A protein has these predicted regions:
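Short acidic, hydrophobic short linear motifs in intrinsically disordered regions
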Residues: 201-213, 222
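A structured, charge-rich N-terminal accessory region that forms the first stable segment of a protein
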Residues: 1-43, 48
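Short, conserved secondary-structure transition motifs
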Residues: 99-124
């Protein structure tokens, strides 16, 4: 039996104080807002994907060992802390749960993930699996709880403690916190990168996609994430970029081109603040960022989130 982890947890609401069933429904509504599988992320069938991994794990009497395969990037690390938190206390203690987790592989100088490895290279990783320890479960539960909390300071604190049990977690958390509006201009790191590329007037999203990773230590931005960011920036009031899509683009998320607006150019230059100019209503994990409320921002000089 096998299953995939398909939830882009760094986007949309992941609030605290919900049962697993309630959280599942929140995520399904976010990923398929029109009650159509994959409505916002056409590559996903969230109703199936989000329930399948739970069902596979619950059938523990049908396997001797559960092997988790995860990478070092933000997407995988958030799914890892969720699944470890979910498993802990649900599976019998005698059930073997093992983890294969890598951030590099010989012969792949800019390692992107398991998907680029040949079958024999993937098979070679099996002997490197290690049984999940109690320390790993505890760290995952602490990080998952902090990720879902209504304020991000606890998550900020997690990455400053000893996270060696999950060696890629601290860097992933840091990258997630950089998606908060920055103190310098109100843009997230991803928004700033996309607006920078939009200075090349008329650049296509398909051309922008690989360049979004130029300054990233780990590849995590999906085509759905890029399309969502471009749409948000084009729909803000006033818009920060224009998004032109040909007729019949349909589910092809990256069939379109972008260009900076005057407001986008001013925000990118630091002459205006994105939150002040356009307002904000966004979920990051358990934090609901809204104009008029307590806003948290990423201070790149101090390398932490601060209230503003």
């Amino acid at each position: 039996m096998s299953s995939i982890w398909a939830d882009v947890l760094y986007e949309g609401p992941v609030p605290a104080n919900l049962s697993d069933a309630e959280l599942l429904e929140v995520r399904v509504r976010f990923l398929a807002p029109d009650d159509e599988p994959g409505a916002s992320h056409p590559s996903l069938d969230p109703v199936n994907d989000l329930r399948q991994w739970r069902a596979v794990i619950e059938r523990s009497d049908g396997y001797d060992e559960l092997i988790l395969w995860f990478e070092h990037d933000l997407f995988d690390q958030l799914n890892l802390i969720q699944v470890l938190s979910w498993i802990h206390g649900r599976l019998p203690s005698e059930k073997t749960v093992s983890l294969v987790m890598i951030g590099s592989f010989a012969g792949h100088p800019r390692f992107k993930g398991l998907g680029e490895l040949r079958p024999d290279e993937i098979a070679s990783l099996l002997d490197r699996r290690q049984r999940v320890s109690e320390l790993q479960y505890q760290l995952a539960e602490a990080a998952w709880g902090a990720f879902r909390a209504p304020a991000p300071d606890g998550l900020d604190d997690i990455r400053r403690r000893d996270t060696s049990a999950l060696p890629y977690l601290a860097a992933a958390i840091t990258r997630f916190l950089q998606e908060y509006p920055w103190t310098s201009d109100g843009l997230s790191r991803t928004e700033r990168r996309l607006l920078s590329l939009a200075r090349e007037s008329g650049i296509s999203l398909i051309s922008a996609f690989p360049r979004m990773h130029d300054d990233e230590q780990a590849y995590y931005i999906t085509d759905g994430s890029l399309a969502s960011t471009a749409t948000d920036l084009a729909r803000s009031l006033p818009p920060l970029l224009t998004l032109s899509q040909p007729a019949g683009a349909g589910a092809d998320l990256l069939r379109g081109s972008i260009a900076l607006t005057e407001t986008g150019r001013a925000v990118l230059a630091g002459e205006q603040d994105r939150v002040v100019a356009c307002g904000l209503d966004r979920w990051l994990g358990g934090v609901h960022l809204q104009s008029g409320g307590t806003l948290w921002r990423w201070d790149d000089t101090r390398q932490r989130v601060i209230p503003s």
